[in-house]
Amino acid sequence: MTRIRRGYIARRRRTKIRLFASTFRGAHSRLTRTTTQQKMRALVSAHRDRGRQKRNFRRLWITRINAVIRENKVSYSYSRLIHDLYKRQLLLNRKILAQIAISNRNCLYMISNEIIK
């Protein structure tokens, strides 16, 4: 019997996986089975770390806001600022507040003084 050549579907799938893993080191970029395993592992890590990144940035923003607020007044803190913002119904999220705190501290001081009154 003559040899039957298989279709291109499996080859196309492996090529796609190889392109994804082309920047991996060693056998992880060459061998099909390890490439497939590393691709799954990379995608799992990427999915997990997207959630972690959101948490880490939120922590960073809160730390920055708290540091700038505590410089201005001794008795004022981040939690009081956020509480007063909600009481006054000012819709400023933590990312924007952190950017204001870094770039223009006087503006953040003005905001905090206004909401204290």
Swiss-Prot record:
Gene3D superfamilies: 6.10.160.10, Ribosomal protein L20 (1.10.1900.20). Its main location: plastid. One of its GO terms (biological process) is ribosomal large subunit assembly. Binds directly to 23S ribosomal RNA and is necessary for the in vitro assembly process of the 50S ribosomal subunit. It is not involved in the protein synthesizing functions of that subunit. SUPFAM superfamilies: Ribosomal protein L20. InterPro entries: Ribosomal_bL20 (IPR005813), RIBOSOMAL_L20_CS (IPR049946), Ribosomal_protein_bL20_C (IPR035566). It is found in: Plastid, Chloroplast. The gene is rpl20. Keywords: Chloroplast, Plastid, Ribonucleoprotein, Ribosomal protein, RNA-binding, rRNA-binding. Transmembrane segments: none annotated. It comes from Platanus occidentalis. GO terms for molecular function: rRNA binding; structural constituent of ribosome. This is Large ribosomal subunit protein bL20c. The keyword Plastid applies. GO terms for cellular component: chloroplast; ribonucleoprotein complex; ribosome. The keyword tRNA processing does not apply. Belongs to the bacterial ribosomal protein bL20 family.
